[in-house]
Curated annotation (Swiss-Prot):
Enzyme class: hydrolase
EC number(s) stated in the UniProt entry for this protein: 3.4.25.1
GO BP annotations, alphabetical order: antigen processing and presentation; fat cell differentiation; proteasome-mediated ubiquitin-dependent protein catabolic process
Organism: Mus musculus
Entry protein name: Proteasome subunit beta type-8
Amino acid sequence: MALLDLCGAARGQRPEWAALDAGSGGRSDPGHYSFSAQAPELALPRGMQPTAFLRSFGGDQERNVQIEMAHGTTTLAFKFQHGVIVAVDSRATAGSYISSLRMNKVIEINPYLLGTMSGCAADCQYWERLLAKECRLYYLRNGERISVSAASKLLSNMMLQYRGMGLSMGSMICGWDKKGPGLYYVDDNGTRLSGQMFSTGSGNTYAYGVMDSGYRQDLSPEEAYDLGRRAIAYATHRDNYSGGVVNMYHMKEDGWVKVESSDVSDLLYKYGEAAL
């Protein structure tokens, strides 16, 4: 009601969008998604399934129509003795077209949770912002922060409800809770994995090669920063769909901090000079 007062609505009046459906016990707005409602789901448009609709365009060679999402990125995250390091590139592509060189592929869910973007940018941003809302509601209802495990499970449950409907998302959820640092991988199929190290995107094979050669649990913060920095920089050198700058975050016990934004061209030049 405080929001209605702020908007200037008279007391005692409730607009249609603010009323609950008494018969179902859930919200009357079919486009609202909330775990607090009895039937938390988004309304789908009438007609054929989204995957069948897209397939009908992709198979017609005479019209030369191709609606296959072509995208690329390189994101990584790994745990070590001082928390979790998250490093991503910043190049956004639409097929062979580079649409942006300054896209931040880390979504700041709350001061103790971070999510990465890999796949379709719209899907990643929408669902992780929805996750941020649910994490905030959990805090308001329970008086404590949601755990990293529970947050990743919420995102996985969202993906399971829309499995096979054309979503494209591969995200890493990292944070710090009562159990310490946590790192999970969640994709559009609802897959949820816990681990020490993950990398997603078209350049992940190159990033894994660098991380595997230098990763240790007892890394110092500066060594961990350099490892994440090198992994993204060398991945952008080999992968045409990755580039821009290296955005790096460090998840600590008292919350995340943004470490740096370094241009990959400058980094590769510096590494090349050091190798001579």
